[in-house]
Amino acid sequence: GVDVQGVMRAFVQTYLVKGSQQGGSSLTQQYVKNVLLMQAIEDNDSIAQYHATEDTVARKIREMLISVQMEKKYTKAEILQGYLNIAQFGSNLYGVETAAQRYFSVSAADLNAVQAATIAAITKNPNKYDPLIEANQEESQKQRNLVLDLMAQEGYISEKECTEAKNTPLKDTLKVQDVNVGCQDTGDYAFFCDYVVH
């Protein structure tokens, strides 16, 4: 398959962090925010839940400080892996493995370049670029093609592979299957999932 982590890392760093990222938070900060919220919900700590979601400078500073410590302790690949395991990849889909199973009926480790690019593109705006929503498919394909261009620029695929992949209609690549989704299927993280959804 494709180096999914490499593709996701290149996309996240080039497109989300350096590009038109919303909210001003780094990937590590977004991950920290989600982990803090998840932990507060697991602990049934309403005060910690409030502090994990409050829209204040204090919360941002707290996230930045924890992010700095995380970046000292963990590699970028480990942080990315953690983020990808809890990030949203479409309507009620969390984690890259679930997305790979849902959209393409394969494990994330077995994604090809087109599939990996499609999933990477969804992270920009999971509801807007969900490829299963017919009204989204044109925009989703445009985003996928931007990721394919980045993959070629970063050397993950050749220019020829990029051109062929971009000429492949998005709908022709989908092999949709039902997966366990929703808060009841998130195991220990059901409360976190429910909070995020509602």
Regions found by a protein language model. Give the residues of each.
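Peptidoglycan glycan-strand catalytic modules in the bacterial/periplasmic cell-wall system
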Residues: G1-S158
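Non-catalytic structural connector segments
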Residues: S158-H198
